[in-house]
C-alpha cells in the first residue's frame, strides 16, 4: 500500500473513507502500549513485557527503556487454550457444555447464571492456568521473582484475578484497557514525528547550535528502540 501510492478506500462504522498512505512506522505491539505509561520506562531499568493474546503469550524484556529483541519469546498459552481447557474440565466433571462467553465472563468476575460447582471449577482452572503461565515464563529464562512484569492483552485480566501472594513475584503492572495498544501506537508515532521535525529544524540553525540540538534530539530517541531516525 505504501509503495503503490494509490488511494485506499474502506468503510468504518458506516462512514466511507479514502486515504493515501504517505509514511509507515513500525513498533513492537506490546512496547507501543507502554507509551501510555511512560513513567514505567523511566522508573525501572529492566522489566518483562507479557502480551497475553488469543493464541500466544508474547514475552520480551525491556532494558533501559529499549526492547531487548534477542529476548523475544512466544508461549502457546493464549486465552483460547485456557478457555478450551476449562470447557473440557467442566464437561468432564458436570456433563455441561459452557459457551466461550460464559467462561470468559466468569474468568473476568462478571455475572453468569451457573451453579457454584461450575463457578468453582472455572476459578480453579483459572488459577491453574495462571500457575502454568508463570512456570512456563520462568522456564523460558525470565525470573519473575527478580524483575517487574507488565501484563496486557485479553488474558491479563484473568491473571490479575488469579495471582496469589504466595507466587512471590517481584512486581506486576496490569494494562487492562483493551485500547491500550492503539493509544500507545498513536502516542509513539506522534513522539517520533516530533523528534524528526526537531532534527530537521537543526539544519536551519547556525552550525554550532544545530550540532548541540541534534545531539539532544538523538539522545531523546532512545526510548523508541534507539533506531527511530
Task: Label each region the model flagged.
Residues 1-47, 67-81, 101-149, 153-224:
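Nucleotide/phosphate-binding catalytic cleft detector across ATP-hydrolyzing
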Residues 50-54:
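Active-site-proximal alpha-helical scaffolds that flank and shape metal-associated catalytic sites
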Residues 57-61:
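Short beta-strand scaffold segments in enzyme catalytic cores
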Residues 63-65:
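A short beta-strand motif that forms part of the nucleic acid-binding face
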Residues 86:
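P-loop NTP-binding/switch modules centered on Walker-like glycine-rich loops
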Residues 90-93:
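Acidic, metal/cofactor-coordinating or nucleic-acid-engaging core segments within structured domains
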Amino acid at each position: 500500500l505504501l509503495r503503490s501510492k494509490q488511494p485506499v478506500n474502506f468503510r468504518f462504522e458506516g462512514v466511507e473513507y479514502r486515504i493515501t498512505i504517505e509514511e509507515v512506522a513500525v513498533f513492537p505491539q506490546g512496547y507501543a502500549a507502554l507509551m501510555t505509561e511512560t513513567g514505567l520506562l523511566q522508573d525501572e531499568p529492566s522489566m518483562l513485557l507479557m502480551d497475553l493474546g488469543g493464541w500466544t503469550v508474547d514475552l520480551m524484556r525491556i532494558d533501559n527503556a529499549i526492547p531487548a529483541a534477542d529476548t523475544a519469546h512466544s508461549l502457546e498459552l493464549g486465552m483460547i487454550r485456557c478457555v478450551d481447557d476449562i470447557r473440557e474440565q467442566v464437561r468432564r466433571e458436570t456433563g455441561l457444555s459452557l459457551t466461550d462467553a460464559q467462561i470468559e465472563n466468569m474468568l473476568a468476575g462478571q455475572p453468569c447464571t451457573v451453579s457454584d460447582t461450575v463457578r468453582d471449577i472455572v476459578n480453579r482452572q483459572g488459577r491453574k492456568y495462571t500457575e502454568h503461565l508463570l512456570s512456563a515464563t520462568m522456564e523460558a529464562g525470565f525470573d519473575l521473582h527478580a524483575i517487574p512484569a507488565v501484563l496486557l492483552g485479553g488474558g491479563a485480566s484473568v491473571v490479575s484475578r488469579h495471582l496469589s501472594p504466595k507466587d512471590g513475584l517481584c512486581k506486576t503492572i496490569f494494562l487492562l484497557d483493551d485500547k491500550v495498544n492503539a493509544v500507545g501506537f498513536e502516542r509513539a508515532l506522534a513522539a517520533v514525528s516530533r523528534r524528526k521535525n526537531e532534527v530537521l529544524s537543526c539544519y536551519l540553525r547556525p552550525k554550532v547550535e544545530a550540532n548541540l540540538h541534534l545531539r539532544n534530539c538523538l539522545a531523546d530517541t532512545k526510548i523508541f528502540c534507539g533506531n527511530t531516525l
